[in-house]
Amino acid sequence: MPIQVLPPQLANQIAAGEVVERPASVVKELVENSLDAGATRIDIDIERGGAKLIRIRDNGCGIKKDELALALARHATSKIASLDDLEAIISLGFRGEALASISSVSRLTLTSRTAEQAEAWQAYAEGRDMDVTVKPAAHPVGTTLEVLDLFYNTPARRKFMRTEKTEFNHIDEIIRRIALARFDVTLNLSHNGKMVRQYRAVAQDGQKERRLGALCGAPFLEQALVIEWQHGDLTLRGWVADPHHTTAALAEIQYCYVNGRMMRDRLINHAIRQACEDKLGGDRQPAFVLYLEIDPHQVDVNVHPAKHEVRFHQSRLVHDFIYQGVLSVLQQQLDAPLPLAEEAPAPRHIPENRVAAGRNHFAEPASAREPAAPRYSTSSGATGGRQPAASWPHAQPGYQKQQGEVYRQLLQTPAPRQPALAPEAETAAPSLAGHSQSFGRVLTIVGADCALLERDGNIHLLALPVAERWLRQAQLTPGQTPVCAQPLLIPLRLKVSAEEKSALEKAQTPLTDLGIEFQSDAQHVTIRAVPLPLRQQNLQILIPELIGYLAQQSAFDAGNIAQWIARNLMSEHPQWTMAQAITLLADVERLCPQLVKAPPGGLLQPVDLHSVMNALKHE
């Protein structure tokens, strides 16, 4: 067969295969055209699920008579005129394919009138060459599009259409998505002559919430948390449901919009899912209605035939921005503040133990908290905000196969060679010979956060949160070199008082040694880097607490600051497992060997089983 140019009708039908998937696709394209025309009221009339009739009437700006024929031609649009326009597109449509594609698989009639015209005009295309006929008509200012007998000339496509009810449900969902995107537009949807949906335009926030309840249901509105988050040219607003009360029905509500355009973007969904994963079970999904506003130059919307997906030029920045925005509002809602309490100062850890450990524990971003009286109760990481688990009834079972394998590997690990100590270090620090010792064998987990150990033939109970706090303090305490700082992708900007600013400036050197880097101006401080153990914490709460602590101090020492931070970090383990406990103890043995040799009372306590055993021997 020789190469030849396809007839216009056939070419349009091929293009319609991408644009016109089902009646709901037609409704989406036509309603978006009405929105681009500035309509504030759109009426959608459907018959037989859209197979017989789709009528879209709006009060937009209308189309001039001279442009009606072009409106039905391929690649004809009023939205863009150059590549620069495409790269900064803000309208919903821009390709100029929708009307031509729809008219090639249906009987389409376009009637429109502008405010400057005294009469309306009607256009329709027919024939093999899709010739357009224009004639006068009666119509108010605005546009009406009628699509009759969809897929009448493509029987194969019509055969794959579902039942009338199913097709209308898809149309109903499209209108719901558009109504969520444009609260300022009235949308009326009717089916077979019966009014089904009426979404009236609203402007005030209270009215928006009522419309949100009408669109998403009262259960979602009751659990919805408001999000207002901004950084530079990025803005995130909307609602996310409380993950602790998300049901399977609520999880179906997942709507996200980029610059007013409805999206099904994997990057956005992943960021939201990651922010909520700690509060959701493995088989549950978050519920949300979110609006992302971004510089149009930073997003490419021309990557999907139906414009369902976009590509961000700085995808990691957008991901972390959405993640932190959602996580921030979840933490503010879910974590109740705990009362402040004075804590006894813990002895400073010996910096030389970092050298003896023989490895960099900054690769393990965990955190710790004293169970007695923590000052800081929220976390912004993927592990933050968990509720404390019930204690004794949830004791862990015996070894699992994977955990036992981890434990056997740890037992086979040879003790690292001890570095030679300088004479002054030998007198100032405890002997590191204890590093070759261990806490013993982990038998089981008791009460969610205690490990039952067998050590030297005796049974001991070890507080895992306390061990974790000691480990974090050792990780944060600078040794011969400062702690490595991790730059924040989105710097944290906080307003501070003159007293707090003065304290920060005085403590800048020890904070830098701890890996906390900041810049200050007249009334604000911008946190630009933190050590890795702090990356998974809610810095919006932890950093102000730290600034308040520094403002109360007269002297600033990196060790004392590291101790305070370690005591106020949020633990990532509400319920410890055997594998987690074994890994933690192995890290503590390597990094804090003096705790193995002389454990403090708050860390390890012996369990007297002899009296119990003697009682069992009585007949």
From Swiss-Prot:
Pfam families linked: DNA_mis_repair (PF01119), HATPase_c_3 (PF13589), MutL_C (PF08676)
Q: Which CDD domains match?
A: HATPase_MutL-MLH-PMS-like, MutL_Trans_MutL
**Keyword DNA damage tagged:** yes
GO CC field? mismatch repair complex
A molecular function (GO) held by this record is: ATP-dependent DNA damage sensor activity
Its BP terms in the Gene Ontology are: mismatch repair
In terms of superkingdom, the source organism counts as Bacteria
Q: Where is this region: Disordered?
A: 364-399
**InterPro entries this protein is in?**
DNA_mismatch_repair_CS (IPR014762), DNA_mismatch_repair_MutL (IPR020667), DNA_mismatch_S5_2-like (IPR013507), HATPase_C_sf (IPR036890), MutL/Mlh/PMS (IPR002099), MutL/Mlh/Pms-like (IPR038973), MutL_C (IPR014790), MutL_C_dimsub (IPR042120)
This protein's record includes keyword DNA repair: yes
| Biased composition range(s): Low complexity | 364-375
Instruction: Give the record's keywords alphabetically.
Output: DNA damage, DNA repair
Q: Which PANTHER family match?
A: DNA MISMATCH REPAIR PROTEIN MLH, PMS, MUTL, DNA MISMATCH REPAIR PROTEIN MLH1
Q: What does this protein do?
A: This protein is involved in the repair of mismatches in DNA. It is required for dam-dependent methyl-directed DNA mismatch repair. May act as a 'molecular matchmaker', a protein that promotes the formation of a stable complex between two or more DNA-binding proteins in an ATP-dependent manner without itself being part of a final effector complex.
Q: Which family does it belong to?
A: Belongs to the DNA mismatch repair MutL/HexB family.
- Record protein name field: DNA mismatch repair protein MutL
Q: Which organism is it from?
A: Citrobacter koseri (strain ATCC BAA-895 / CDC 4225-83 / SGSC4696)
From which lineage does this chain's organism come? Bacteria, Pseudomonadati, Pseudomonadota, Gammaproteobacteria, Enterobacterales
